[in-house]
Amino acid sequence: MGELADPVVIGTITAPHGVRGTVRVRPAGEGRHLREGLSPLVGGRRRRILRARRTPKGFLVDLEGVPDRFRAAELRGEDLLLDRSELDAPEEDEFYVADLVGLEAVDERGGALGEVIETFPTPAHEVLVVRGEGGLLYVPFTREHVPEVDPRAGRAVVRPPEE
């Protein structure tokens, strides 16, 4: 990742769109960093976002140096990365999905369930993957299942879904 000291994924290119180099991007989180003027690292180089618009299926983004569908198709699967220092400061009670990895997952009584080892998006919401003594636990990242997150304390209160 070269020039990024603390890279954070802001989105992933899922497909080309049209013939003029536009790419479809699945945002990480709400996608507030997918906006004109920012220059994420994409495919090994910085590419300025020339235009970004939200759609029901994610975002459509025009990137500098991607003039046609063929170049756009070559970027399928590439992450858009910014250094953490380039991100907007989170609002109060907000955090980045990347900040969830490494948190201790505890139940409502404070009992250890394991560690959040990764997250992944689904059409409905992010899912936390918690590794504990009993194996992997997949937890929808919703208020119902994760009522409290405290990155400073390094923990998240988790209500695992009923089997």
Curated annotation (Swiss-Prot):
Domain notes: The PRC barrel domain binds ribosomal protein uS19.
SUPFAM superfamilies xref list: PRC-barrel domain, Translation proteins
Every PRC barrel domain range: 92-162
Self-association state and partner proteins as the record states: Binds ribosomal protein uS19.
Cysteines paired by S-S bonds: none
Main location per the UniProt record: cytoplasm
Annotated source species: Rubrobacter xylanophilus (strain DSM 9941 / JCM 11954 / NBRC 16129 / PRD-1)
Protein name: Ribosome maturation factor RimM
Molecular function terms from GO: ribosome binding
Gene Ontology CC terms, in alphabetical order: cytoplasm; ribosome
General function of this protein: An accessory protein needed during the final step in the assembly of 30S ribosomal subunit, possibly for assembly of the head region. Essential for efficient processing of 16S rRNA. May be needed both before and after RbfA during the maturation of 16S rRNA. It has affinity for free ribosomal 30S subunits but not for 70S ribosomes.
Keyword vocabulary terms for this entry: Chaperone, Cytoplasm, Ribosome biogenesis, rRNA processing
Any one Pfam family match given in the protein's UniProt record, by short name: RimM
GO terms under biological process: ribosomal small subunit biogenesis; rRNA processing
Localization (cell): Cytoplasm
Similarity comment text for this entry: Belongs to the RimM family.
